Structure formats: C-alpha cells, structure tokens
Swiss-Prot record:
Keywords: Cell membrane, Flavoprotein, FMN, Membrane, Oxidoreductase, Pyrimidine biosynthesis. It catalyses: (S)-dihydroorotate + a quinone = orotate + a quinol. It comes from Escherichia coli (strain K12). The gene is pyrD. Belongs to the dihydroorotate dehydrogenase family. Type 2 subfamily. Its cofactor is FMN. This is Dihydroorotate dehydrogenase (quinone). GO terms for molecular function: dihydroorotate dehydrogenase (quinone) activity; dihydroorotate dehydrogenase activity; FMN binding. InterPro entries: Aldolase_TIM, DHO_dehydrogenase, Dihydroorotate_DH_1_2, Dihydroorotate_DH_2, Dihydroorotate_DH_cat, Dihydroorotate_DH_CS.
Length: 336
C-alpha cells in the first residue's frame, strides 16, 4: 500500500502543517469523482447502538475534521461513522503554535490545539453539502472565553444549530486544553449541565420530530470514585452513550522521549491500556445501562478487539489513523 511512502513525506513536515496539507488535498476531492482515489471497499458489519444503525463498528474520532470539511472523502475510506468537531458557537483560533507534536517512537501525539475551529454556523453549512451515508456525529464544546459557569449555554447554542443535521451529538467536557473544561465532569456542575442538555434534547425532539442521541466524552484521568460518580450521573440523566476516552495528561509511558514534556493531551499507543482500563471499569459500573464508544490508542485489530472485550459497543480511531493510514480502517473492519 502507498501510505508508508505518503507518511514518510508527511512526517518531514511540522505535524500541523502536514495535517493542513492533507486536508487541502482531501478538500479538493471531497464530493467529486476523485474521491475514488481514497475509496476502499469494506465489509458491512452493522451494529445497532444508541438507537442508530452503524454500517460497521469503526468510527473516526473527533478532532481530525474539526469543521466538517472532508466528510465525504473520509467516508469513502470505509468509516462506519465520522465524528466531526469539536466545534464551538463562535469561531476561535485555538492556542498558540506550535501546538501539535509527534512522539514517533511511541506512535503517540501530544496536542494542545484548544478547540481551533471556524464556528458552528460554518460547520453546519459544510454538513449540508455532504452526502455521507454513515452515521455523522457532531462533537461540541464551549468557547475558551466563555466562563465555565456559563459553559452550558455554549453547548445549548451548538445543540440548537446542529440538531437537525446530526446522527448523534457528542458533548466534550474532557479536553485538557480549554481552561476549566474538565471541571464540568464533576458533581453539581455535571448534573447542572446534563439537566440542561437533556431538557434541550427533549425540546428539539418535539421541534424536529426526531430523536438525536447524546453521548458524553470523558477523560481517562478519572479516579475510581470520580468514574463511579460520572457513570451514575449519565444513567440518572438518561444520557444515550459515553465516549471513553479523551487524551491523557499522564506521561509515565513516554518519559525521556522527544516532545514528552510538551503541555497538552497525549493520544495514540501510550493511551491504549489506560483507556481500555477505563472502559472496563466503566462497563462494570454501567452494567449495560448505556453503551460505550471506545477510543484511545487503537492501532490494530487486536487493540480494537480489546476495547470491545472491555465493554465497548463501537470503537474510534485518530492517532492510529495518522500513523497507519487508510489501510488500518479496512484491516480493523474486516477482521474485528
């Protein structure tokens, strides 16, 4: 397959520049006959989850296509679902560059992007143009300059604007790169947010005559007690699913490696075992009461199977996709 050669060339570039270059090419072909250049035939392996039918259990995690610019081209590669975003109500530039770093030996990435995106209105226009026939998730967050205590308003604004176009909505309260965001995972703040989100979901269901499930994305750095409290809150508020996990602040597996001391969230292979353990513990706590979407360090069929064995109904990839390319999609879907 050609990807090892493509990767070698892309890895000569700064990581964010490589991302921008790749998306520039994908934007050119998305929605055109040239999508055939990236199209892969993968077997149909339907999974029912959150009331939706996924063509196969493998999805693209949020963060790669923040603005929904390349939905069709990414869909042509064989993903059963694509999660775009994280998107915020207003455009924002994110954190200062450089803000994305490779840990090549560990096949990991550290990012402190900071929800850089062109805003929810722009994303909706891109979604309207797409023809992807898989499940489209839209991941939403709060603007950096919105005080945490008013953060729920940003989620509600995004929900209102995307509801008609989303297969499911992912609530990102676990990025380590927006100050204070992770505090929304705890106690009263979480209950307050989930109450508001559930009320808004009910209102929008009545308005649009369709039910769009809500999944909450959690961090891998939760203690046992915190994880139990989060699981309890999700069940009490009738949330439809949980995405486990986001990136980690833990650097124990990458000590001494180039870029290991960079601030931000670590993803890729170093996150693999940690996220799988969170899924296992979460699954025991939830006991089948809501489904888990497993993400974190999946870079092989074995890693995907481990997530499912731990309790995930669906899995997503991001860093593994960067390091292994489109062949990883076909490999996982075929053999999972």
């Amino acid at each position: 397959m050609y990807y090892p050669f493509v990767r070698k060339a892309l890895f000569q570039l700064d990581p964010e520049r490589a991302h921008e270059f790749t998306f520039q090419q994908l934007r050119r072909i998305t929605g055109t006959p040239f999508e055939a250049l990236v199209r892969q035939k993968v077997p149909a392996k339907p999974v029912n989850c959150m009331g939706l039918t996924f063509k196969n259990p493998l999805g693209l995690a949020a963060g790669l296509d923040k603005d929904g610019e390349c939905i069709d081209a990414l869909g042509a590669m064989g993903f059963g679902s694509i999660e775009i975003g994280t998107v915020t109500p207003r455009p924002q530039p994110g954190n200062d560059k450089p803000r994305l770093f490779r840990l090549v030996d560990a096949e990991g990435l550290i990012n402190r992007m900071g929800f850089n995106n062109l805003g929810v209105d722009n994303l909706v226009e891109n979604v309207k143009k797409a023809h992807y026939d898989g499940v489209l998730g839209i991941n939403i967050g709060k603007n950096k300059d919105t005080p945490v205590e008013q953060g729920k308003d940003d989620y509600l604004i995004c929900m209102e604007k995307i509801y008609a176009y989303a297969g499911y909505i992912a609530i990102n309260i676990s990025s380590p790169n927006t100050p204070g965001l992770r505090t929304l995972q705890y106690g009263e703040a979480l209950d307050d947010l989930l109450t508001a989100i559930k009320n808004k979901q009910n209102d929008l269901q009545a308005m649009h005559h369709k039910y769009v499930p809500i999944a909450v994305k959690i961090a891998p750095d939760l203690s046992e007690e915190e994880l139990i409290q989060v699981a309890d809150s999700l069940v009490r508020h009738n949330i439809d699913g949980v995405i486990a996990t986001n990136t980690t602040l833990d650097r124990s597996l990458v000590q001494g490696m180039k870029n290991c001391d960079q601030t931000g969230g670590l993803s890729g292979r170093p996150l693999q075992l940690k996220s799988t353990e969170i899924i296992r513990r979460l699954s025991l706590e939830l006991n089948g009461r809501l489904p888990i979407i497993g993400v974190g360090g999946i870079d092989s069929v074995i890693a995907a199977r481990e997530k499912i064995a731990a309790g995930a109904s669906l899995v997503q990839i991001y860093s593994g996709f960067i390091f292994k390319g489109p062949p990883l999609i076909k490999e996982i879907v075929t053999h999972i």
